[in-house]
Structures are given as structure tokens and as C-alpha cells.
């Protein structure tokens, strides 16, 4: 989840509290929590980075038709009334007043994630609350509906977060999701710096299983990173945040949208070339590398250098991993996507790799393998694995209220109309 942007320049910051490393890690931590749009705007205003030819190519700085990238006279957002209908309408079965909103547990570009208890059911949920105005301003309606669509397909897979309800008020959208309180993989990596190989293998296997399932539905995830990987209360992986997913990508299909998280962008994405499902296997390689070594494979504090590393620098692997791990990383982090592991048979190639030979995949999917780490949460109210930056923040009163219709402006009504079809209530037997 995106929190806040790092400063464009400034003195080195310390990181003794978590990893015991200094400026490189605090810069890394802040940088990767930025949305890609904010990150691109940051490097576009950095004179040093802009001089690098690879960065210029990525940003197309020499072309004046993209003023928003340079923060120069950005064009106004389109009128909400001109937005597309985002899907077939359904009868909403939930409203904000159905919930007690207890704690802020996350923040994103368009809103917050809150721990909430359903008043009638006494069930705990993670409720993602998004501001329509912010979504429309950045023209992100398609990504929001894409996230909803992907969530609707997730109820059958154990390593993907499930959607229980989605509904809307005049000014907000609400995703009512599984509540997962074992912490982000990123949080645990901060604390422990890296994992032993058996633990990294277990997580990589569950992640690969989730990605393989999405690919079987012709969905490319595109934003795999430790912040989007949660641990449940037993220590199993749960993949979340599907806003950048691309639907309807057949086995040999490609797409070309420039999106993702900077440290994890595959070379073909940076080159603005068409890319396919193998972009997810590159990201899996980057996450596995980080679990084993503590940082992504081509990371640099200098943006231009990091992009140049991804595009041109050979993969460097220290000798403290097994040969099978080395071989897997070399296959996943292959710069030529046509030669990348998974290019031919997708998930089948991954699970058949020798690195995963200790994994019984049937037991894995049925959660019969004991996780190597137990978060030891005492119950839903145990928030020890959430960042205090979130949990110390007061819950806004407006979250649990529907705006008074008398006070709603015409523009707010138009915004509401832009998200027709967002609301969702599952069939009675969908979770049986």
C-alpha cells in the first residue's frame, strides 16, 4: 500500500530501528511505498535523474505532449458525468452504518483500510474505503473496477484475499474484505532482514500458486511486492491489492501499460515493450531474491542507476544460497522474457523446478503444510503486526456515515453515477 512519498533530496536518514542499516534502507522503504505515478513525478523533477538516457526514454521527457508528468499545467480531470459505466448494477446489501469502524490499518492513494466489525454478524473485516473524487481526478475508475472484478473471482483460492461485499455512498466506495492480521511480508522482512531458504521457499510456493491461479483466469497481477503479500493468523500467504491487474490476457497475449512498482519493474516494462504473464514471474524472482538477500536484485538509491541496473546489469548472486535457488533466480530474473522461466508452460514450469522439489503441491493448496513462521496473534484485536503509523491515526467520523442527500452537490451526484455497478452482494451459497 502506498503511504507517502520520499523527499526528492535531503540528508541521509537512519534505519537503526528496524534493519540496523542506514540511509540506503530508509530510502528504499519510503521509495517503494510510493505509487508509481508519484514516483515518476519525483524522478521527472530530479535534474540528475532526467539526464540519464534510460530515464529520458522511459519518461519521454523530450516530448512536450505529457505535461502532467512534469507537474507543468496539468490538464483538469474530466467531468464525472463523462465517465464510463463501470459494470452492471446489482442490489447493495450493505451500508456504512452496518459496521463499527475500529482502527485504521492501512492507507493508499485513494483512501484508507480499516478494521471493522459488522454489527449484526459480529464478524471482523478489513474495509477498504476509497474517495470517488480522488479516483476520478486521476482517471483510475477502470483500475478500481478491475480490482473489484478480480476480487469476485478470488473466493475459491486459499492464497488470495476474498471480497465479501462492495457498496458505495455518494462520495465513497467500500470493499469489505477478509481481515488478515499476520502482517505484511514487507513488515517481517524489515524486522528480520532476510529469511532462511526453507521459509523463503514456502512463501514463494504459495505466491506462485496464487499467481498461477490468476493466470488460469487470464489475469496478470503486475504488482507483486512484499507490501501486497500478507500473512494470515497461521502464517500462510494472502495476496492482496488487485488494482493493477490486467484481465483477459490469453496465454500468448500481451499488454503494454507502464505500471508496477519501480524496484520490481521487468526490463520489457521499462523498455515500454509489450509484455505478458512472464512479468509476474520476474516479480516472483525479485521477491524471492529479496527474501534471501534483504533487498531487491537491482536496487539502488539512485533512480537512474537502478533502472540501468534492471536493463543492463548482469544478475549477481552471492554464494550463500543453494544451487537450486541460484538456478531458479537465474531463470525468473532472465531479462529476455521469451527465455524466462514460465515463458512456455507458465506455472507448470515453476512448480516443477528442482528448488520446489520438497513441496507437495496438493498439500500446499490444502494448507496441510505447517507454515515456517506463526505470527502468534491472539485474536482480531491483536494489531501488533500493523504499522503504528496507521493504527495510531484516528478513524474519521465520515467513514461510517452516508452523506445527507440534501447537502450533496451536483458534482458528487455525478461522481456517484460514474460508479454504477460497483455494489456487490454474494449469492447465499457463495461461501458455503
Swiss-Prot record:
Its domain of life reads: Eukaryota
- Kindly state which keywords UniProt assigns to this record, in alphabetical order: Apoptosis, ATP-binding, Cytoplasm, Endoplasmic reticulum, Kinase, Nucleotide-binding, Nucleus, Phosphoprotein, Serine/threonine-protein kinase, Stress response, Transferase
- Domain AGC-kinase C-terminal intervals: 357-432
User: Which amino acid positions bind ATP, per UniProt?
Assistant: 105-113, 128
Q: Where is the composition biased (Polar residues)?
A: 82-92
Domain named Protein kinase is located at: 99-356
Q: Where is the active site?
A: 223
Which InterPro entries does the record match to this protein?
AGC-kinase_C, Kinase-like_dom_sf, Pkinase_C, Prot_kinase_dom, Protein_kinase_ATP_BS, Ser/Thr_kinase_AS
* Enzyme Commission no: 2.7.11.1
Q: Which reaction does it catalyse?
A: L-seryl-[protein] + ATP = O-phospho-L-seryl-[protein] + ADP + H(+); L-threonyl-[protein] + ATP = O-phospho-L-threonyl-[protein] + ADP + H(+)
Instruction: Name the PROSITE patterns on file.
Output: AGC_KINASE_CTER, PROTEIN_KINASE_ATP, PROTEIN_KINASE_DOM, PROTEIN_KINASE_ST
Enzyme category, top tier = transferase
One GO CC annotation: nucleus
Per UniProt, what is one GO molecular function of this protein? Answer: potassium channel regulator activity
The GO annotation for biological process reads: apoptotic process; intracellular signal transduction; neuron projection morphogenesis
User: Where, subcellularly, is it found?
Assistant: Cytoplasm; Nucleus; Endoplasmic reticulum
Region annotation (Disordered) maps to 67-93
Return the similarity comment.
Belongs to the protein kinase superfamily. AGC Ser/Thr protein kinase family.
Free-text function comment from the UniProt entry: Protein kinase that may play an important role in cellular stress response. May be involved in the regulation of processes such as cell survival, neuronal excitability and renal sodium excretion.
Q: What is this protein called?
A: Serine/threonine-protein kinase Sgk1
Organism annotation: Gallus gallus
What gene is this protein translated from?
SGK1
